[in-house]
Amino acid sequence: MGLALFAERKVEAGVSVFAGQAAALPGSDAERQAQGLDHTEVYPLMMFAIGGMMLFPASGDLLTMFVALEVLSLPLYLLSGLARRRRLLSQEAALKYFLLGAFSSGFFLYGMALVYGYAGTLDLGGIDLAIRNGSGNTGMLTVGLGLLLVGLLFKVGAVPFHSWTPDVYQGAPTAVTGFMAACTKIAAFGALLRLLYVGFGADRWTWQPVLGVIAVLTMLVGALLAVVQTDVKRMLGYSAVAHTGFLLTGVLGAQAAGDLAVGQVTSLQAVLFYLATYSFATLGAFAVVTLVRDASGEATGLDRWAGLGKRSPLVAGAFAFFLLSMAGIPLTAGFAGKWAVFTVAMSAGAWPVVLVAITSSVIAIFFYVRTIQVMFFSDVAEGTEPAAVSVPSMLTSGTIAVAVLGTLVLGVVPGPLLELAADAGQFIR
């Protein structure tokens, strides 16, 4: 579905939504000359990013993981700055993303060096064996793990490494935003699970309390700051931060195999299932955002969405359904996903974190329902031009339809995907 959003680039009288030339300064002669050209850089960059995302969670050692991190990150830095409209905002977001991403990569690399100094290997299995044997300086191991987590938590958008998320979500082309929101988060959490469960599973008493604090801060900051947003894409950015906290709550549910009851949902199952449910709702939501436009491009101001339910009830209804899933309303995939991660966290004794997660979910319901209220029960303010809904292409319509179907089916029948997630968990282990 993320690929479908990329493929649908010509939405304004046949003109690409991406900038005509990546290296051109906004408003320059070079940009005006390239304005009508197809932007062929987009597809190679996207394929490089996908290659890195596939390698990232499959890495068996820290060096390969670092290379995959860079392969997926560098194309995203460029793609974030390619919006044809609002070029300055897009390039500002890309620059912030690049600078902060470079720092996080440096932390990850330094953490690799410290872990190698402790274990004498970068292989995740070898690191786990060294921890179990108790060899080396444990202080070096702890600092090294902390620096590795900085690099990965930046990619998933956890507090306090989240500041890039709302800016990039707002400034990047919406197709890129949807791609990043779903695919990058899946790849980054896959790598995080592999690092913690395979390489540092024997040291979980060290990283679980730290992740617990980060999860609490991430959920509260994401939910509270989303309440005051007036831009739809920026609101979804802070919503993504809150969902990162919910996913980290599931990671806290890691337990030894012997501690699990028969048939109990594992932490891996819960997190992978939540990632699937979140991806359906997120890709569907951003697909809808690409359709709501005005003469200057995408209309993402919340006041412009007033009365959208009257002008285009199907599009507004689909967006409302995705928001209800993100809120965790029963009979949606989001409810099943939150139930899974909260259950495994409770079984591992992380009930204080679960209480904060429930509180954050209640706060999040406010801004989701507020958006629905604006679309269906509000009129456009006097002097404000209402946003129109462009005619969706086959690819965009298919993306929204598949997202709606997936969100509904996973909310009603979550069992098959949970079983599939259990099998996928064997790969991560």
Where are these regions (language model features)?
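Alpha-helical transmembrane segments of multi-pass membrane proteins predominantly involved
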Residues: 1-429
